[in-house]
Curated annotation (Swiss-Prot):
The gene is MINAR1. The chain crosses the membrane at residues 892-912. It comes from Homo sapiens. Residues 913-916 are extracellular. The modification Phosphoserine is found at S711. It is found in: Cell membrane. This is Major intrinsically disordered Notch2-binding receptor 1. Keywords: Angiogenesis, Cell membrane, Membrane, Phosphoprotein, Transmembrane, Transmembrane helix. GO terms for biological process: angiogenesis; negative regulation of angiogenesis; negative regulation of cell growth; negative regulation of cell population proliferation; negative regulation of neuron projection development; negative regulation of protein ubiquitination; negative regulation of TOR signaling. The lineage of its organism: Eukaryota, Metazoa, Chordata, Craniata, Vertebrata. GO terms for cellular component: plasma membrane.
């Protein structure tokens, strides 16, 4: 005790120093000061405490610090600096974010409280609150809090003992308000809003302090600060933290918690009775671990006191009437309660119902917690994991005490309206919203994981069914009843995981889950469900929390609630639970889930962006098709005058005239919307953008480098043939159309003969420019298959509809002008040498010069169509040129021969004849 007390005082000292220097000393200086003045072990303990305290805040980015908590650096100095930096950062985050974490810090002086809150955070918000109350009383609860034991009720002794000794609560505005806890603390809410919320619990609990403990299910003792850095905290330490009345946390957090408690108490006023029995059983189980807290009945309060509770229950976040308010109204609500966070009121009401029925768990405890069986708040996890007995008490033993209530209260409290039922992995699954008591009683079996599974089967089926019927099941359980197996898995894995997983894992997972923007997650789920789901499993960012668990997008319904329902029903969690059941794999699996969830969210964002493009692409394809038709009509005179039989070349490309803009539209429709739903779509889209940039560059270069002697149409034909062979891409119709036109041009060229080659080349160039899209198809000719694929499947850099507006659009106009200015359309480069040689001429043309050029005339399709460097056509062009040269030589030779013959016939023959 002496050592623990000293440690507690020491930690409090550090926190006080941080608080005093927070606004006056730089971050680096604070870190240096901590490193210089404290040992690594001390700093590590403090970091652990702060981390778990901060984890109470759903907004806390636990994932950023989770790995660091486990980081093993050989260099002690470096590790010390890292730990100090983490301490300062976490401390600042707690101060800025306030909420449950900050409220917990005020247990002693607010700083001390903060540290204590860290321990308490390990316990639970409720416990922290209790600890805060008891801590002012120097209750054993403090020890329990630090020990991270859910036995917040254990702290009831402290409550009893300390409450007697503890001074009256100070005004809530005073950071030390938590310190002075007394039976009056029932009205402590007056001084501490969150305590006020507890006051209703206090009604059931002997003292507000007890209420708080009861309200905060997690005891630091039981939970241990963290699995790695569990900081054994004896009562003295807790008392020390408690004794420190320095306001460590901003009142706003406390007020939020108070508000939450008020709302919660509105719902949980009846729950104390429920909590009482449950808490008693839990306390009994916990007593070995920590002192029994007869007032543990408020265990629901503890669960409600969850870090999320303060925010969710806070009137600010979800006033009793507003607890059901828009899920997205409050990030805190959303994060803490996941998708159902905003429904605390109903949850509370249901919690009351549950309280009325000891077997029923209050859905309030943690909506997201109930949803995320695996991701229960640290205090819940510790509550379940700190001691197997506690776990049993809370989850498995919940049945004995209506254990569902203790844990479910924590979770269901939030979930009760919607989430709790699906969220309740086991006992929670037991209809917390008035689910059958037997469902809740089944948690007794839950103590036994198999019975828990059974319970899951029943209760989850019932839960999903009944919960769906139940108001608390609102979107979650009404949507889908988990399959018995899934429910079992969810519950079993949830409880097993809770009990098996270390508090730290729970807190870390919860923190990670909570740290994500739940509103974004739900929007993503909505998008995914609307888009048809990418088929990617949403790893349970909020597995246990219920915010997000592994949801197969196929499982996702149109509404995030539906998705959550499935999650709550354990559909995603069942898989996650199965995968996570091994304790050794749970943590990494949770991290993987978190990363996958983030990836899915990112994909969802991209998809949403792409969705807006699908319509545009369709329109562009249509416009482009029309432009191609018009262009063909315009080119008909040229074709008639200059028909070259290059169709042989174009014949290579399938003349899929059927591939009309409509076909392209269809393709875009199929690929666009489908791709949007498919992760590949993002890739294809990205490749499309890349290809576009490549095309733009190629266009610029090709504009300069193409020799007039070569026929762009020939290139287009060859390219089109390749493209056609490659795939029936949305652009195939463009390619085909262009190919046909090119074929005509080639025929014209052949018919025209070498003399008309220049004109034909000029016309073909114009045509090519007009058909800038076909050049894109030509790009596939390039050696790089990837680029070709991009060209084929990616959207055109200048869709017809887009080009129609390019003239007026400064973005496209400038780009076009720049490209034109850089390149004189005279000589496309057909070889790398030519390309490199002509590249230097890009910047020669000025804007005025460009404007004077016919190709730069916006009224001319050539203005909208640019040539692309197509090295693949070198051989083709050379072959053609060779043929033309041979034809010329043959003609010349023929002429010479004819002349010679004529001379012979005209001169020689007559002479000979005359001679003869």
């Amino acid at each position: 005790m002496e050592t623990s007390q000293e440690t507690s005082l020491f930690l409090v000292k550090i926190l006080e120093e941080l608080d005093s220097k927070q606004n006056t000393v730089s971050y680096q200086d604070l870190c240096k000061s901590l490193c210089a003045r404290f040992d690594l072990s001390q700093l590590a303990k403090l970091r652990s405490v702060l981390f778990y305290t901060a984890c109470l805040d759903p907004n806390f980015p636990a994932t950023l610090f989770k790995d660091k908590m486990k980081c093993t650096v050989n260099n002690q100095q470096s590790k010390k600096i890292m730990v100090a930096a983490d301490i300062v950062t976490i401390f600042n985050l707690i101060q800025m974010n306030g909420g449950a974490a900050k409220e917990k810090l005020p247990t002693g002086r607010q700083k001390v409280r903060k540290k204590e809150a860290s321990f308490e955070s390990c316990r639970s918000d409720t416990e922290i609150c209790n600890a805060a109350e008891c801590e002012p009383l120097n209750c054993e609860l403090s020890e329990r809090s630090f020990s991270r034991g859910y036995p917040i009720r254990q702290s009831s002794k402290c409550r009893k003992m300390d409450c007697k000794d503890c001074p009256q609560f100070v005004p809530a505005s005073e950071p030390n308000f938590l310190l002075g806890v007394s039976k009056e603390v029932k009205n402590r809410a007056a001084s501490l809003d969150r305590l006020q919320a507890l006051a209703p619990y206090s009604v059931t609990s002997p003292q507000p302090c007890e209420m708080q403990r009861t309200y905060f299910p997690m005891n630091i003792e039981n939970e241990s600060i963290s699995d790695q850095d569990s900081l054994p905290i004896n009562q003295s330490i807790k008392e020390t933290f408690i004794s420190n009345e320095e306001p460590f946390v901003v009142q706003s957090c406390v007020q939020k918690r108070n508000i939450f408690k008020e709302d919660f108490h509105n719902l949980m006023a009846v729950s104390p009775s429920l909590v009482g029995p449950i808490s008693k059983a839990e306390n009994e189980h916990r007593e070995p671990q920590s002192r029994k807290e007869p007032h543990k009945p408020p265990f629901f309060n503890h669960s409600f006191e969850m870090p999320y509770n303060s925010q969710y229950l806070n009137p600010v976040y979800s006033p009793v009437p507003d607890k059901r308010r828009a899920k997205h109204e409050s990030l805190d609500d959303l994060q803490a309660s996941t998708y159902f966070g905003p429904t605390p009121v109903m949850g509370t009401q249901e919690a009351r119902r549950c309280l009325g029925k000891p077997n029923k768990q209050t859905p309030w405890p943690a909506k997201s917690w109930s949803l995320n069986t695996e991701e229960v708040p640290d205090f819940e996890r510790s509550f379940f994991n700190r001691n197997p007995s506690e776990e049993k008490l809370h989850y498995p033993n919940a049945s004995s005490q209506t254990p569902n209530f203790p844990a479910p209260e924590r979770r269901p409290t939030y979930l009760v309206p919607k989430d709790q039922q699906p969220i309740l992995p086991i006992a929670y699954a037991a209809k917390q919203n008035g689910l059958k008591s037997k469902e809740i009683s089944s948690p007794v079996d839950l103590e036994k994981h198999e019975p828990v599974k059974k319970f899951k089967d029943k209760s989850i089926n019932c839960t999903s069914g009944q919960l769906s019927s139940d108001t608390s099941s609102v979107g979650t359980q009404t949507e889908h009843v988990l399959e018995p197996k899934k429910c079992r898995d969810l519950c079993t894995s949830g409880q097993g995981k809770y009990s098996d997983r270390h508090t730290m894992k729970h807190s870390d997972d919860d923190s990670e889950i909570v740290s994500d923007d739940i509103s974004d997650i739900f929007r993503f789920l909505d998008d995914m469900s609307i888009s048809g789901s990418t088929g990617v499993i949403q790893s349970s960012c909020y597995n246990s929390t219920g915010s997000l668990s592994q949801l197969h997008k196929s499982d996702c319904d149109s509404s995030p609630e539906h998705n959550l329902t499935k999650i709550a029903n354990g559909v995603p969690n069942s898989k996650g639970d199965k995968g996570n059941r091994p304790e050794n794999t749970h943590h990494s699996e949770e991290e993987l889930k978190t990363s996958v969830c983030k990836l899915v969210l990112r994909i969802g964002e991209i998809e949403r962006k792409l969705e807006s493009l699908s319509g545009v692409r369709d329109e562009i394809s249509q416009v482009l098709g029309k432009l191609n038709k018009l262009d063909q009509k315009m080119q008909q005179p040229e074709k008639v005058s200059v028909q070259i039989d290059l169709n042989s070349l174009t014949s290579e490309g399938p003349s899929d005239d059927s591939a009309s803009p409509r076909m392209f539209h269809a393709h875009s429709g199929s690929h666009g919307p489908k791709l949007e739903n498919n992760p590949d779509w993002c890739c294809s889209d990205a490749s499309g953008s890349n290809s576009e940039s490549l095309r733009v560059k190629a266009l610029k270069k090709s504009l300069f480098t193409r020799p007039s002697s070569r026929s762009l149409t020939e290139e287009n034909s060859a390219t089109e043939s390749k493209i056609a062979s490659i795939s029936n891409s949305p652009r195939d119709w463009r390619t085909i159309t262009y190919t046909n036109r090119v074929g005509l041009n080639e025929e014209e060229i052949k018919d025209t003969g070498p003399g008309d080659n220049k004109d034909w080349h000029r016309k073909s160039k114009e045509a090519d420019r007009q058909y800038d899209i076909p050049p894109q198809h030509r790009l596939p000719k390039q050696p790089k298959d990837g680029f070709l694929v991009e060209q084929v499947f990616s959207p055109h850099p200048y869709p017809a509809s887009l080009k129609a507006h390019m003239k007026s659009n400064p973005l496209y106009t400038d780009m076009r002008l720049t490209e034109l200015a850089e390149v004189k359309r005279g000589q496309p480069s057909w070889t790398i040498e030519e390309y490199a040689r002509n590249a230097g001429d890009k910047g020669k043309l000025t804007a005025l010069d460009l404007q004077t050029q016919e190709s730069l005339n916006p009224n001319n399709l050539e203005y909208w169509m640019e040539d692309i460097y197509t090295p693949g056509y070198d051989s083709l062009l050379k072959r053609k040129e060779a043929e033309f040269r041979r034809a010329k030589v043959c003609k010349i030779a023929a002429l010479i021969a004819a002349a010679a013959c004529t001379v012979i016939l005209v001169i020689v023959v007559p002479i000979c004849t005359m001679k003869s």
